[in-house]
């Protein structure tokens, strides 16, 4: 019988799933991860609730991801935004995992509350994110996103490819 129980996923626990050489961050409040397939990622095939804010950008590859029991096909140039308490599960990982490449930004609610963010705007757009947390970025935004992620990596000391 398949184990379908959920568990809470914190940033500290999330970091355990990826090699230290592929991640950087600020204690357990902020983490930037260059996600390549690793056997430890199979743990994400079990439902979990992330207790912070997570943004996952698909550089290359296809996986299926369930967010709040809705299944999404994640492909190149997709941006996934998960809000606190979202139920997450990787539902399908392709056999050829060499081509999978994602960049993940995860932050605690406490860290996010310290950022200068217009929460009125976030809340109004947050309703849309609850309905559809997966966005396919237009081609002109893809290059801008790559530059932004490179800048974040440089400032944090990470080495993203």
Per-segment meaning from a language model:
Residues 64-66, 82, 88-97:
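Short beta-strand His + acidic residue motifs that chelate non-heme Fe in jelly-roll/DSBH
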Residues 1-66, 70-73:
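Generic protein-terminus/edge-of-domain signal
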Residues 2-3, 91-158:
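A hydrophobic/aromatic-rich effector-binding and dimerization subdomain
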Residues 69-84:
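Short acidic-glycine-tyrosine-enriched beta hairpin
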Residues 60-63, 85-87, 108-112:
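Short, charged/polar surface micro-motifs in flexible loops or helix N-caps
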Residues 39-44, 88-92, 114-115:
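A short, acidic/glycine-rich surface segment
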Residues 49, 81, 106:
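Short aromatic/basic micro-patch
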